[in-house]
Amino acid sequence: MLGARAWLGRVLLLPRAGAGLAASRRGSSSRDKDRSATVSSSVPMPAGGKGSHPSSTPQRVPNRLIHEKSPYLLQHAYNPVDWYPWGQEAFDKARKENKPIFLSVGYSTCHWCHMMEEESFQNEEIGRLLSEDFVSVKVDREERPDVDKVYMTFVQATSSGGGWPMNVWLTPNLQPFVGGTYFPPEDGLTRVGFRTVLLRIREQWKQNKNTLLENSQRVTTALLARSEISVGDRQLPPSAATVNNRCFQQLDEGYDEEYGGFAEAPKFPTPVILSFLFSYWLSHRLTQDGSRAQQMALHTLKMMANGGIRDHVGQGFHRYSTDRQWHVPHFEKMLYDQAQLAVAYSQAFQLSGDEFYSDVAKGILQYVARSLSHRSGGFYSAEDADSPPERGQRPKEGAYYVWTVKEVQQLLPEPVLGATEPLTSGQLLMKHYGLTEAGNISPSQDPKGELQGQNVLTVRYSLELTAARFGLDVEAVRTLLNSGLEKLFQARKHRPKPHLDSKMLAAWNGLMVSGYAVTGAVLGQDRLINYATNGAKFLKRHMFDVASGRLMRTCYTGPGGTVEHSNPPCWGFLEDYAFVVRGLLDLYEASQESAWLEWALRLQDTQDKLFWDSQGGGYFCSEAELGAGLPLRLKDDQDGAEPSANSVSAHNLLRLHGFTGHKDWMDKCVCLLTAFSERMRRVPVALPEMVRALSAQQQTLKQIVICGDRQAKDTKALVQCVHSVYIPNKVLILADGDPSSFLSRQLPFLSTLRRLEDQATAYVCENQACSVPITDPCELRKLLHP
């Protein structure tokens, strides 16, 4: 919308405070650029004011955040700032005292959130300014994604990007007029310090308040128009073939041939893109583009797994790579990355049969089970990037994960027998993983000099090349490296651990249920499926209100590992319902326990009541009541680090239609896809997960029915055959012969399907017709993957 953009450009009167973004999950140009402030506003603000300095003896007096449950809010509970949580008390105070609201949004494992808390929010003078001249509100973006999305939309629309911490100044009516990300405490030659920002906004609020209010209203009006997503006068979604090809072309243009991935730096894991490429390969596998799509996805996954973005010692993946080579990561570990990447590597194994990918998937889930799992079955949110190198020292990014040559030599001094030259286990490991005496981290990736002389493990050579270099057997090298990594892992346990965000989110737990269910099904490992089952039980026991049928967004780890909730509870958002429903559908297909399918249908009904836009189509991110007062009610239109909840919902609706035959689900899916038509036509690469749903909707969904006893060996053999083949556009149904069962009541045709000669029997049904009965898993595989 050019008119809105033009207006937004006119109100940007602040000089740019820096060249890049604050620490952002969507990306930033480098660690160095992360440090620059991004500012957008309607307030003129010259650079070069007086700096401010943190107090050397901050008083440990708690503010009202001490009563919150969020780990992020509790990190600010001893700031000399009169913080309020998001809520009516803060809004009433702002209106009564006619003060602007200072809104600061972040999350507990955010590196630059820690920096700003230490540099600015612990500063006594800044604390007085924030407490006396503003109503200061602190928000955990993971608790309130609706608040985060609304004001991030403003920051991104009025500046060069966004990130966290996000700092926005609002009118008492919650309309934004100044926004930015990380601010340094002091002014620099090209950067505006936070104290200067506060003083200038205070001055402008006193002298030019009416102008600020008018500008704020115009910006809000422009954002409302710009964020409109609606069916309009369109009757149907666009052609899937056209949108698919355009999406592939856009990805192909940005693909890194050498290292994989789709950007220079920083490089983020992109599971939604990889899933799209796998689906594109399946529908174009006899074409050159199809082969290329598969190669792009598999190469990216292999380079990521070999790079430093993967924790080779403790498993799991870090948040993103600061360089093109996937070498030096931002060391934070997020639950949603582990969940989605486990699925991506499992799919890669389905496609390729290469156990390299299944081993990576198993490693991810091993990490989650060990480090991100609550004893009752739920999953924690994240581990921080920062930790003290030694107890009592100041935290540094990556300290827990990096190694010096001296450390490795001391831990692995054993000689390697049979090598063509004198060699220790440590030297073998350092050669394979690229460790050097000077450290293997470029100064450009370490602007603060915290990682000098340190090494990030990254695979430099194949096992075959390392073995050949020293005249060793490949399996012997594999054993030696695995043994060495285990010793490093045991030694690492004695280091101070990074902060664990033990908050549990329904949405991310739903993704993790999918991660365990899909991987367990593909690999035929009931142990992994049991983790998914326990996760679903946790969601139902601790994050579901039976009386209202609603999900809760959050719960927290209390003393002794107990599960606690905020009072009042934080109710679920669209993504909580969409991701949990997906997890339950995946769990049903993995376990064939119909109770999970029944719960998924009930949650989908609740989602429709709370979030569906009956006029424009698609789902709003938040309930109307919960988001009351916010200037925007948005529909998420981008598949990023997490898939858009609308994209996931489109898939869920298709699958629910396949499981039940109810036409309403299909009609809703078509309406949703139609509402996002323009976005998919223009920039399909922004919605690859929704483009997959569009393709699935315009193809024929397969209903694969297995008639048999759930626990029988022949039934399990047919089920495992289905899971071994990559078939994204299908539902797997178990028909146990009970006419009163849930699925038999939903799909009457199941009663017409019979077991052949009292054996478990498979039918592949599409377009209201079923294949001949099949009892041989090999024959079924041929039919599913000709």
UniProtKB/Swiss-Prot annotation:
The keyword Signal applies. Residues 1-22 form the signal peptide. The modification Phosphoserine is found at S649. May play a role in fertility regulation. This is Spermatogenesis-associated protein 20. The gene is SPATA20. Its main location: secreted. It comes from Homo sapiens (Human). It comes from the Eukaryota. Keywords: Developmental protein, Differentiation, Phosphoprotein, Secreted, Signal, Spermatogenesis. One of its GO terms (biological process) is carbohydrate metabolic process. Residues 23-61 are annotated as: Disordered. InterPro entries: 6-hairpin_glycosidase_sf (IPR008928), 6hp_glycosidase-like_sf (IPR012341), Ssp411 (IPR024705), Ssp411-like_TRX (IPR004879), Thioredoxin-like_sf (IPR036249). GO terms for cellular component: extracellular region; mitochondrion. It is found in: Secreted.
